[in-house]
Amino acid sequence: MNKKNREVTSSWFTNLRDLVCAEFEKIEEEYAKAKGLKPGKFVRSSWERDGGGGGVMSVMKGKVFEKVGVNISTVFGEFSKAFRAEIPGAELDGKFFATGISLVAHLKSPLIPAMHFNTRYIETSKNWFGGGGDLTPFYPEEDETAKFHAAFKEACDKYDSGYYPKFKKQCDEYFYLKHRKEPRGVGGIFYDYLNSGNFEQDFSFTQDVGKALLSVYPEIVRNKLFLPWTDEQKEYQLIRRGRYVEFNLLYDRGTKFGLMTDGNVEAILMSLPPEVKWA
């Protein structure tokens, strides 16, 4: 395992966490000031993993963001024998290192899309990057969806013209609820096991994916910050959030990885919305 690679990736994920939290708090402040309200602030709590490593949860429950969580973690140790066969390169001795950031935003307004994003770096006897971002609007708009996709396409095209179509397809396939035969949202990009043989290039790409999110999602939120919405629209949002919960508990790799490596349960389930309904 490469100590330098572990340090620079972990440092970047911490830096990205700080940038995201600062921008989301700024949005809270803009809205609260206009409405004469007290803005929400992120509350941080750290946790340690018995087998090695730990992380920091940052959660804000505000006036714009009903619940937004930004997690960073760096964990290491050995996979259980039952889990080794599922992770590339872990079948030899089970040793692993994983560092990353994961964030999920659930907005009060049903007109503003929910958003999920994560990027990570993992080492076993092999090493790779993974991650992506996806948008879940309750009332989809073509222009908004196109803008979200364009930001990630621009990041992808800097490195390989084949990245965006490949990663978009993987996102569409991954965020699909098989039991309901419907997509979770309008997609984005999703990549995993990325190792081109050039660590610096793959790391730079992963950084640009994070920067792409910062360039587009705050703008999407601000565009609808002051739009009025109805009780009926809120009710529909709560029902559609059920799909989000179903996916995360049934299919999400990150949820499974966290639970199988004895991660912090509250951090793992942070992605779940604070309020949800089933019809």
Curated annotation (Swiss-Prot):
Q: In which pathway does it act?
A: Porphyrin-containing compound metabolism; protoporphyrin-IX biosynthesis; protoporphyrinogen-IX from coproporphyrinogen-III (O2 route): step 1/1
What PROSITE patterns does the entry give? COPROGEN_OXIDASE
- Write out the residues that bind substrate: S102, N118, T119, R120
User: What EC number(s) would the UniProt record show?
Assistant: 1.3.3.3
What's this chain's function?
A: Involved in the heme biosynthesis. Catalyzes the aerobic oxidative decarboxylation of propionate groups of rings A and B of coproporphyrinogen-III to yield the vinyl groups in protoporphyrinogen-IX.
Note whether Oxidoreductase occurs among the keywords: yes
Q: Which InterPro entries match?
A: Coprogen_oxidase_aer, Coprogen_oxidase_aer_sf, Coprogen_oxidase_CS
Any Gene Ontology biological process: protoporphyrinogen IX biosynthetic process
Pfam families linked to this entry: Coprogen_oxidas (PF01218)
Where does the record say this protein resides? Cytoplasm
In chain numbering, the residues marked as site (Important for dimerization) are H179
Enzyme class of the recorded protein, top EC level: oxidoreductase
Query: What HAMAP family is this protein classified in?
Result: Coprogen_oxidas
- Outline the subunit composition: Homodimer.
Q: Where do the record's region annotations for Important for dimerization lie?
A: 244-279
The catalytic activity, as recorded, is: coproporphyrinogen III + O2 + 2 H(+) = protoporphyrinogen IX + 2 CO2 + 2 H2O
Q: Which domain of life is it from?
A: Bacteria
What is its cofactor? a divalent metal cation
GO annotation, cellular component aspect: cytoplasm
Record carries keyword Oxidoreductase: yes
The organism of origin for this protein: Rickettsia bellii (strain RML369-C)
Family note: Belongs to the aerobic coproporphyrinogen-III oxidase family.
UniProt-recorded name of the protein:
Oxygen-dependent coproporphyrinogen-III oxidase
Active site residues according to the UniProt entry: H116 (proton donor)
The major lineage groups are:
Bacteria, Pseudomonadati, Pseudomonadota, Alphaproteobacteria, Rickettsiales
